[in-house]
Amino acid sequence: MNSKFQLILSTFVVIAAFTLLPRPCASIEFHRKLSSWSNGGATWYGAANGAGSDGGACGYQAAVDQAPFSSMIAAGSPSIYKSGLGCGSCYQVKCSGNSACSGNPVTVVLTDECPGGPCLSEPVHFDLSGTAFGAMANPGQADQLRAAGVLQIQYNRVPCNWGGVMLTFAVDAGSNPSYFAVLVKYENGDGDLSGMDLMQTGAGAAWTPMQQSWGAVWKLSAGAALQAPLSIRLTSSSGKTLVASNVIPSGWKPGASYTSTVNY
């Protein structure tokens, strides 16, 4: 009986000790939460309650101050602008080092490039619109926060979610029957693109890679008249693909915009 009791007691002690050990999964999750925010710098440009510049280096033009962007935009340092491949990506930004900071995150979309000044002196820098910079403030203290001019902030890359806004293909005004250029906006998820392909209509139709022209504009020089309707395949920065079948109709026009029923 004594040996049996000792065996039971030893088993209990081992189990109890095991339950007190740190759980690897819990520790990993804890550190993941700690590392979800990174440090960066922020300034602001343009009008105090404006959208930064009129359009920006990504090519979104008047869309920057209209819904759903609604002036909540940022010009990114080279590390996040990525020569235009970062256009359309979404970030949460917040500040806490100024008495006017609310500490609450606000979401901005990358629509422009910040090529100099503090954007080159820090690994990651956001030159925010006046609207977005002020949105980080306590209620009624937006002007006080903007007066600071420069802030240290925390930022986090987040999925874009444009609600019911449709994926839009804006055909460049310089397009013609054999040269096609297009800007895509309002992509959910990654928001930015790493590749784009086009497929014409007709026998033997196949996907043809497009090239980045500038900012968020992609182009294809076909050498002959393109046969519409045209389908476009998007590849996001994380490798996710999406096909917008026949999104560019027959009789398409340069400068016109066409919407898709699909989105990421």
Curated annotation (Swiss-Prot):
GO CC terms, sorted: extracellular region; membrane
Main function: May cause loosening and extension of plant cell walls by disrupting non-covalent bonding between cellulose microfibrils and matrix glucans. No enzymatic activity has been found. May be required for rapid internodal elongation in deepwater rice during submergence.
Lineage, opening ranks: Eukaryota, Viridiplantae, Streptophyta, Embryophyta, Tracheophyta
Signal peptide segment: 1-27
One Pfam family named in its UniProt record: Expansin_C
Topology in membrane: Peripheral membrane protein
Swiss-Prot/TrEMBL keywords: Cell wall, Cell wall biogenesis/degradation, Disulfide bond, Membrane, Secreted, Signal
Family matches, as Gene3D superfamilies: Expansin, cellulose-binding-like domain (2.60.40.760), RlpA-like domain (2.40.40.10)
Domain Expansin-like CBD: 178-260
Alphabetical list of InterPro entries matching this protein: Expan_Lol_pI, Expansin/allergen_DPBB_dom, Expansin_CBD, Expansin_CBD_sf, LolPI, RlpA-like_DPBB, RlpA-like_sf
Any Gene Ontology biological process: sexual reproduction
Family: Belongs to the expansin family. Expansin B subfamily.
Subcellular location: Secreted, Cell wall; Membrane
SS bond partners: 58-87, 90-160, 95-101
Protein name per UniProt: Expansin-B18
Record domain Expansin-like EG45: where: 55-165
PANTHER family: EXPANSIN-B15, EXPANSIN-B3
